[in-house]
Amino acid sequence: MNPPKSAPDAQGLSYRDAGVDIDAGDALIDKIKPFAKKTLRDGVLGGIGGFGALFEVPKKYKEPVLVSGTDGVGTKLKLAFHLNKHDTVGQDLVAMSVNDILVQGAEPLFFLDYFACGKLDVDTAATVVKGIAQGCELSGCALIGGETAEMPGMYPDGEYDLAGFAVGAVEKSKIIDGSTIAEGDVVLGLASSGIHSNGFSLVRKIIERANPDLSADFHGRSLADALMAPTRIYVKPLLALMQKLTVKGMAHITGGGLVENIPRVLREGLTAELDQDAWPLPPLFKWLQEHGGVADAEMHRVFNCGIGMAVIVSAADADAAIADLTAAGEQVWKIGTVRATREGEAQTVVV
C-alpha cells in the first residue's frame, strides 16, 4: 500500500505544531517529583509516573471503610490569574477535598490532581503542584498521582483549571454521620483563614464594583493576599481530637455557608441555633459586605463568615474540645446549640 502523497512544499506536522509540547510535560514531571516525594507515607507502593497509583490500606484498620471526595477551586482561579499568584491555590485544592472526607471521621490517605490548560507553562504548573504537595503534607496524605492535560484552544493563554481527588479511611465502627446528635449538644466553630474557596463569583463582582487597590495594606498584608489566603486544613487537630472524645458531627463550611452546610449532618427534627455575636466577623467579610451591600442572610449562605469548620459535641465535652483544639493552634468558639426544630423552621438559624 502506497503512503498518501502530500503537496511537494508541505512540511510534516508534529504534535508541537498542534500546540502540545510533550517535552514541557516531561519537564514538569521532573520538576514536581521532589514535591511529591516529600508527601510519601506508609502505604504508598510506587512513585509518580505509573499508569495507576498503588496504595495499601494501613494494617491498623480492622474494618476499613474508604471515603472519597473530589472538588476544585472554583472562580478563585480567575483572581489568581489576574494577580499572577499561583502559590496558594494548590493548598486550596487539597483542603476542599480532605476537609470534606474528614467530616466522616476519615484519615486522608492519598490525593490525586488534575491540571488542565491550553498551553502548558511549566513554571506556573510547578508552582501550583508545589502548593498541592504542601497541602498534602499539612493533611498527612500522599500525592501519588495526577494528570496534566494540555489542550490547545480549550483555555485562554495563562489560564488553567484544577480538580482534586482525595481518598481516606475510617474504621467502620467510627464513621461520623451525625446520627447521635441530640438536643442540648454544642456547636463549636473553628476559625477560617479567610474566604477559603467559595463565593468568589460574588467576591469578583464586589471587586469590580469597588475597584480597590489590591496591593494596598489590609490589616497588615495586602488586600490581594487577604483575598487569596489558602483554605485552612483542619485534618490533624480534628483527627487528634477524635482520639480523645466523641465528635458527633462535623460540617465543612463551603458553598452554602453555615446555614446550608450544618443541616447536612443533622437528623430531621433538629435545628442548630447559632449566635452571630458568639464569634467576631473578620475584617475581610466586613469589607465585602460593606462594598457589596450584601445582606446578612446572603452573607450567611454564601460565605463562611469566619467559621471554616463546625464541630458538634455533647455539652459535657465542649470545654475539653475547645481546650484541646486551642492547644493545637486553632481558634475556637461556642457558636450555637442544637435544639428541636420549631414548626416551619430551617435546620440552621442564625440569631
Swiss-Prot record:
Enzyme class at the top of the EC tree: ligase
Cited CDD domains: PurM
Superkingdom, natural source: Bacteria
Functional pathway: Purine metabolism; IMP biosynthesis via de novo pathway; 5-amino-1-(5-phospho-D-ribosyl)imidazole from N(2)-formyl-N(1)-(5-phospho-D-ribosyl)glycinamide: step 2/2
Keywords: ATP-binding, Cytoplasm, Ligase, Nucleotide-binding, Purine biosynthesis
Xref: Pfam families: AIRS, AIRS_C
GO-annotated cellular components: cytosol
Keyword Ligase: yes
Alphabetized GO MF terms: ATP binding; phosphoribosylamine-glycine ligase activity; phosphoribosylformylglycinamidine cyclo-ligase activity
Swiss-Prot/TrEMBL GO biological process terms: 'de novo' IMP biosynthetic process; adenine biosynthetic process
Keyword Chaperone on entry: no
Chief site of localization: cytoplasm
Subcellular location: Cytoplasm
Catalytic activity: 2-formamido-N(1)-(5-O-phospho-beta-D-ribosyl)acetamidine + ATP = 5-amino-1-(5-phospho-beta-D-ribosyl)imidazole + ADP + phosphate + H(+)
Entry EC no(s): 6.3.3.1
Entries under NCBIfam families matching the protein: purM
Xref: HAMAP family: AIRS (MF_00741)
Sequence similarity: Belongs to the AIR synthase family.
Annotated protein name in UniProt: Phosphoribosylformylglycinamidine cyclo-ligase
Record organism: Burkholderia lata (strain ATCC 17760 / DSM 23089 / LMG 22485 / NCIMB 9086 / R18194 / 383)
